[in-house]
A protein has these predicted regions:
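Active-site phosphate/pyrophosphate-binding segments
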Residues: 1-21, 125-126, 133-136, 142-225, ...
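Glycine-rich phosphate-binding loops that contact phosphosugars or nucleotide phosphates
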Residues: 15-154, 160, 245-273
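Aromatic-enriched
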Residues: 162, 271-277, 290
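Structured C-terminal subdomain patch of bacterial secreted/periplasmic proteins
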Residues: 267, 278-292
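Generic structural signal for helix capping and beta-alpha/helix-loop junctions
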Residues: 61, 109, 229-230, 282
């Protein structure tokens, strides 16, 4: 909560100075995480707001024509050493572009952007996890929207998420038995398919690529609910574990179409798993904020 206030203050600084476009820059997991904020800023923003999600490695190779000295960049690196991000940040600073980072001030990236433009991503116990990255980015992006008159419920959102960390731990504890069951059942599967959409799509990629592929060397196939019917459905067959992450935003109807197909049984695949965020309550959080 207190760290979030620092991100809010940085957003206020940007709003006071003015900007022509917002760039959210990551690589790997941070790119995946920032996808959620891109979705939210486009969902709640006005038609004149320009928000771009950019990949640091791609920006280093080709730049971006809409980025000017009036633009603002938000990036992240929990380690503070991500090579692609560091290279991009240095180039951006040379061009006079404002860069703010969720990273440790003493790290190379933190030093490049300046300690006053950093907010530490890790918690006091050594790590922040994805939730910290999402929360801090949302504090920054939603505050910018609030200053534009697009998200008047900002203060209410911040107040209602003040103790969200405790509730997230409770959700994990309640899901642990099912998680253990799924892990034992599918640990040795040749590959696993993950499907998601909307606000959950970035997290779907992150879980597949960073948690399973990078950390556990598990083969995965991740696909959006929107694209599932344009090729990937042909790969659903007996013995292939399929996980559908169902969200609560406008794209839920796309998830529901996928669920209906999977549950028809026409593929012969019985390893179908539905994880629906609507089944996990967060006390004190209004329905309008659940998509966030």
């Amino acid at each position: 909560y207190e760290t979030g206030k620092k991100m809010t203050a940085l957003a206020d600084k940007v709003a006071d100075e003015g900007y022509d476009a917002v760039f959210l820059m990551g690589v790997g997991g941070t790119w995946d995480e920032l996808m959620q904020l891109e979705y939210l800023m486009n969902k709640f923003g006005d038609r004149d707001l320009e928000v771009y999600l950019i990949h640091a490695a791609e920006w280093n190779a080709m730049g971006h024509k809409r980025m000017t000295e009036k633009s603002v960049v938000l990036t992240a690196s929990e380690s503070g050493t991500t090579p692609e991000v560091l290279e991009a940040v240095k180039k951006m600073k040379e061009k006079g572009i404002r860069v703010y980072a969720m990273t440790k001030p003493e790290g190379p990236i933190g030093q490049a952007v300046g300690a006053e433009n950093c907010v530490k991503m890790a918690s006091d116990h050594g790590n922040g996890g994805c939730e910290m990255g999402y929360y801090l980015a949302d504090c920054f992006g939603l505050r910018l929207l609030n200053r534009r008159g697009c998200f008047p419920q900002f203060d209410k959102f911040i107040e209602q998420t003040k103790d969200v960390w405790t509730h997230l731990v409770d959700i994990r504890k309640s899901f642990e038995p099912r998680a253990e069951e799924l892990a034992k059942k599918y640990a040795l599967a040749p590959y696993t398919m993950f499907i998601g959409s909307g606000a959950l799509w970035g997290e779907t990629i992150l879980f597949s690529m960073c948690i399973l592929e990078e950390m556990q060397w598990k083969r995965t196939r991740y696909i959006t609910s929107a694209d599932f019917f344009h090729g990937t459905l042909e790969l659903v067959e007996p013995g292939v574990p399929v996980f559908l992450f169902m969200g609560e935003d406008e794209n839920r109807k796309l998830d529901e179409r996928v669920r209906a197909f999977l549950n028809r049984g026409v593929t012969g695949d019985t390893d179908i798993n539905i994880i629906d965020t609507a089944e996990f309550a967060i006390p004190g959080l209004d329905d309008e904020f659940r998509v966030i």
